[in-house]
Amino acid sequence: MAGGVGARVVVGRHIYGNLYGCDPQILRDESALITIIKEATKIANAMLLSVGSYRFGPNGGLTVFAIVAESHISIHTWPEYGFATVDVYTCGDHTDPKAAFDYIVSKLKPQKVEAFFGDRSMYKE
């Protein structure tokens, strides 16, 4: 049931956001973004399964993602606009997606952040 009615049987928390005014250099730095996403996984208390990345052209943006046992973390960048989007979705009470999101934000140093939270849990009557 939506809105937290009944007992929660599956815990799912999704924090995601838009980051404006980031340094374009970091948004192009694949190695740095991979390091950031690996550290964010630890901070979220999630179990890292796989990390991947894709560069869109020689000077284009990047998609960097971590598949974790509890779901995923992703960073998508548009360096030409100083813009990035971040998703941290985890399942389980033991994880802290907000801490991971906040860590990524601290490393990308945006001038403005729009953050959103989604309860992706399942509730049973």
From Swiss-Prot:
SUPFAM superfamilies linked: S-adenosylmethionine decarboxylase (SSF56276)
Top-rank EC class of the record's enzyme: lyase
Swiss-Prot/TrEMBL site (Cleavage (non-hydrolytic)) positions: E70, S71
Gene Ontology cellular-component terms listed: cytosol
Matches recorded under Gene3D superfamilies: 3.30.160.750, S-adenosylmethionine decarboxylase domain
PTM sites of type Pyruvic acid (Ser): S71
Modifications the protein undergoes after translation, according to the UniProt entry: Is synthesized initially as an inactive proenzyme. Formation of the active enzyme involves a self-maturation process in which the active site pyruvoyl group is generated from an internal serine residue via an autocatalytic post-translational modification. Two non-identical subunits are generated from the proenzyme in this reaction, and the pyruvate is formed at the N-terminus of the alpha chain, which is derived from the carboxyl end of the proenzyme.
Catalytic activity from the UniProt record: S-adenosyl-L-methionine + H(+) = S-adenosyl 3-(methylsulfanyl)propylamine + CO2
Protein name (database record): S-adenosylmethionine decarboxylase proenzyme
Species of provenance: Pyrobaculum islandicum (strain DSM 4184 / JCM 9189 / GEO3)
Gene: speH
